[in-house]
Amino acid sequence: MRPVLVVDFGSQYSQLVVRAIRECGYYAEFASPSISAAECLALSPIAIFLSGGPASAYKDNAPKLDEEILNCGIPVFGICYGFQLLAQAFGGSVKKANAPEYGPADITIVNKAFFSGQPDRQTVWMSHGDSVIRAPKNFCILSTSQDAVLSFCNRDRTIAGVQWHPEVKHSRFGKHTIKAFLSSFAAPNWDPEQTICGTVDSIRKTVGCKRVLCALSGGVDSVVAATLTHRAIGDRLRCVFVDHGLLRLNEREQVEEYCSSLGLNVSTYDASDCFLSALSGIRDSEQKRKVIGREFIACFSKLQERFDIKPHFLLQGTLYPDLVESGATPGGATIKSHHNVGGLSDNLGFELLEPLKYLFKDEVRKIGLQLGIPKHIVHRQPFPGPGLAIRIIGEVTNKKLSILRAADAIVRHELRDWTDIWQCPVILLSDVQSVGVRGDSRSCGFPIVIRPVSSDDAMTADWYRLPYDVLARISGRITNEIPEIVRVVLDITPKPPATIEWE
């Protein structure tokens, strides 16, 4: 499949560029700014998108694209910094803006090249401190503001760019613009629901006659990965659900029940004592993730002996956002380790099989429904592999886990019908003693944080506006039913700047 390459220059929105292109029906993946023209041509891309970034295109140390790529005949579209790079490369002028623009801005379309059917005046999302003040010679100016060029293209419309961020939902017509550019060169080639056969074939070819051990978490990602792999290799897949003692209330029983209904051969391994012992005394969130990753691998080594299986591959439900946040994409910075990416030991003893690692959550859900997985499983709220360990701020103990499980169960019960909430982590601030009043007497206890968010893909998120009466009912139940908790607070921070999980 010919990709659209997204060269990532460090924009906070780069992942959204990939997602927006896929939503337009074209397969997209990241490429490093260091990619050479020869490497690029070998991939036979439909087009190349240049992302935004924090650098200034006119500075000597600014990251650049191999200029031979611009002469290869491959269509190129620049966004923000990428737009400024194109202006600089073709003889235009880029300078520090009189005033930086961050947030919504009004633009005027003066040429409909890629804006057919769009209003002449529209609001877009800006995030830049530099501006293109002169377009390259023989380029057509497509939109302007009072003192800057906001978009342009060359005469044959194969080189184009915009100063704003069409990938951000606040740019209402952004995806229309992206699709208008791409459709000039190729028909759509991406539908996640149509990739099932290709993924099954790829798994079959990769695995050959070997065996696969699945680290089943019970979430939609691992269930879809297991279902696809089972289609590919049948009973040579062995699924193991590791109870690490960090699960939510009754989660083990629920996972066993619905995995059985899907026909998956699942064995449960209780490793809670091992995990809790390894986590003893650890307060740092990154260290928790690393320890949990190592313990998982240790578990799988023991499982080979217990169940007399000698798998070559370890199957995981790693997704594209996991790779991005772990810095595993070209040029990516590490935001936090994921137990199924950066938290794994270098000496696995297994070869990783990650059939979903280039997919977003919504794409996995579409595939899950196509596979016939029940809707309530497909739309289950995401739950991190390290479980409640990263929702306890401080050391993890059995007592704290019991408190958090009870609070989490209350929140999930009260929000069971709120299907448009992407996720609602419940966090125990176990290193904080908060003062309360009970029975006319002073009391002390833990604060609990609830964090309901709305999102499309977990790359960005906004806090969910729950009605006050729902919040009051949640707070009342938690403080009345769990004596160790004296305070309930609401996290109203979007992502960015905060991640969805606290740790």
Curated annotation (Swiss-Prot):
Keywords: ATP-binding, Glutamine amidotransferase, GMP biosynthesis, Ligase, Nucleotide-binding, Purine biosynthesis. The active site is at C80 (nucleophile), H165, E167. One of its GO terms (molecular function) is GMP synthase activity. InterPro entries: Class_I_gatase-like, GATASE, GMP_synth_C, GMP_synth_GATase, GMP_synthase, GMPS_ATP_PPase_dom, NAD/GMP_synthase, Rossmann-like_a/b/a_fold. GO terms for cellular component: cytosol. Residues 3-189 form the Glutamine amidotransferase type-1 domain. NCBIfam families: guaA_Cterm (TIGR00884), guaA_Nterm (TIGR00888), PRK00074.1 (NF000848). HAMAP family: GMP_synthase (MF_00344). Homodimer. This is GMP synthase [glutamine-hydrolyzing]. The gene is guaA.
